[in-house]
Structures are given as structure tokens and as C-alpha cells.
């Protein structure tokens, strides 16, 4: 027979899960996808490749480089390790331009197309730290998202360089 603390813990966990499910059901899909993109941007700026990978489905495919989820995360880890400064900071930055488009499919509301413009810059080091970041490139990312296991994840993406160059 279960003791009172165990039963109480089970009830709290079940209540938390039900509240989370109810609340996320009230938030529009477009908002949830925007939060996903912003979270991936924040993880990139913090130099957290595995954090970026959390926004990708297990069967993710990056079409421009032909990478799966594991390959993309490992590639980001390599770039982040190479670029990291001696003080541990990651100098590359990704900034989402205000213009992005999210279209949830009417025929299959668990899928969506996402287009995001991302400007990549490099923070200045040393004496020129007060100078504005160095512009590297403006890229357009086009991706497909799927709602799975209670959250949105990218299942595929590709990108095009609009200005400058690829940052890595």
C-alpha cells in the first residue's frame, strides 16, 4: 500500500501535467513556435549546441548540408568549441529579424511552415569591445515543424544566404 507522501507526490505530478497540458492548449500554435525559435536563438547565443538540438525532432533533416539532428548538433558543438574565447564566452550572435512567417497547415494542424530571417554577427574582443558587433551575414531559414509529444519541433530546414556569408 502506498504511503501518504507517495500518493501526494503522484497527485502533485499529475496535477502539474494536467495544468501544463491545459495551459499550452490555450496558447496559439504560432506563439508556441515563436517561443521555440526564440529559445533556439538564445541557446545558440549562449553557445549551447544541445539546447539548439532540443528544438529538433528525432527525425530532423537539414537539407542544405544533408545533416540529421545528431550531425547538426555535433557540427554546432565543433563550431562553438572553435569560436569560444579564452574567457569562455561565445562571440557569435544570432538575432532574429522582426519579419518571420509561421503558417500552420489547415489540412493538418499539427504541421507548420516557418520562415525566419536571422542576422549573424561576431562580438568584438579586446580594445574594440565597445564597437558594434561585426556583421557576418543575413540568412533566411525555411523549416517545417511538427507538433509531437506536447510540443513543436523542427523536422526539416534549409537556408539561403541573403547578405554577407555563412557565419560558419
Feature-to-residue mapping (PLM):
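Residues that act as N-cap/strand-start positions at coil-to-secondary-structure junctions
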Residues: 36, 96-98, 139
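Short, low-complexity N-terminal intrinsically disordered segments enriched in polar/charged residues
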Residues: 2-59, 71, 107
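Short, flexible helix-adjacent loops and helix caps
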Residues: 45, 61-65, 126
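Residue-level detector of secondary-structure transition/capping positions
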Residues: 41, 60, 80, 120-122
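Soluble, non-transmembrane catalytic domains of enzymes that act on hydrophobic metabolites at membranes
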Residues: 44-51, 90, 159-164
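Exposed beta-sheet edge and beta->alpha loop/turn motif
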Residues: 103-168
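Short, solvent-exposed loop/turn segments at secondary-structure boundaries
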Residues: 24, 64-67, 129
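Short solvent-exposed beta->alpha transition segments
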Residues: 53-113
Amino acid at each position: 500500500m502506498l504511503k501518504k507522501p507517495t500518493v501526494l507526490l503522484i497527485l502533485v505530478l499529475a496535477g502539474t501535467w494536467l495544468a501544463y497540458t491545459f495551459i499550452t492548449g490555450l496558447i496559439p500554435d504560432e506563439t508556441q513556435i515563436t517561443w521555440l525559435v526564440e529559445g533556439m536563438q538564445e541557446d545558440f547565443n549562449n553557445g549551447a549546441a544541445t539546447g539548439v538540438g532540443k528544438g529538433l525532432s528525432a527525425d530532423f533533416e537539414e537539407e542544405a548540408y544533408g545533416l540529421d539532428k545528431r550531425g547538426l548538433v555535433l557540427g554546432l558543438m565543433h563550431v562553438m568549441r572553435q569560436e569560444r574565447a579564452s574567457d569562455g564566452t561565445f562571440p557569435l550572435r544570432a538575432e532574429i529579424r522582426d519579419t518571420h512567417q509561421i503558417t500552420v497547415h489547415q489540412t493538418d494542424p499539427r504541421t507548420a511552415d516557418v520562415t525566419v530571417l536571422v542576422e549573424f554577427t561576431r562580438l568584438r574582443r579586446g580594445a574594440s569591445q565597445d564597437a558594434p558587433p561585426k556583421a557576418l551575414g543575413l540568412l533566411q531559414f525555411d523549416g517545417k515543424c511538427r507538433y509531437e509529444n506536447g510540443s513543436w519541433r523542427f523536422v526539416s530546414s534549409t537556408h539561403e544566404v541573403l547578405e554577407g556569408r555563412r557565419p560558419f
